[in-house]
């Protein structure tokens, strides 16, 4: 263990200090506060940016999905044999998705006597032997020639399962 002698350590003495009385004490202080300008948040600008992001996201989702297509159900929710909707309009080239809504076998054929002249119905129709047997199965077509097209389901045409599309 190391020994420390009194000569090596000096302890200050505070005996000569006097306390100032409260009446004689003067305290003076000044402070200068300067604030640097901070950028203000703009809620309006933030909402514009968020809105633009939402619109851009929605637009890309619509382009990537069937949002630009018309969905036509084969069979109504109540079980009736019908196209839903049975009549509709689409712009030329827009995709039409026919979707089996029931467990019944359906198909989609375009009537060769009820399409614009020059349209080859074999290129836009399903084969008469092909059927959408299960619920959720689909057939897609895009019609490019303007005019009225009549279509039907061959197994249920006699029951009135007929529809019409107008291509603008």
UniProtKB/Swiss-Prot annotation:
Spans through the membrane: none
InterPro entries assigned: BlueCu_1, BlueCu_1_BS, Copper_blue_Plastocyanin, Cupredoxin, Plastocyanin
Segment annotated as transit peptide: 1-69
GO CC terms of this entry: chloroplast thylakoid lumen; chloroplast thylakoid membrane
Residues engaged in binding Cu cation: 106, 153, 156, 161
Keywords for this protein: Chloroplast, Copper, Electron transport, Membrane, Metal-binding, Plastid, Thylakoid, Transit peptide, Transport
Bilayer topology annotation: Peripheral membrane protein
Protein's cellular compartments: Plastid, Chloroplast thylakoid membrane
Molecular function GO labels: copper ion binding; electron transporter, transferring electrons from cytochrome b6/f complex of photosystem II activity
Biological role stated in the UniProt entry: Participates in electron transfer between P700 and the cytochrome b6-f complex in photosystem I.
NCBIfam families according to UniProt: cyanin_plasto (TIGR02656)
Protein name: Plastocyanin B, chloroplastic
Organism field: Populus nigra
Gene: PETE
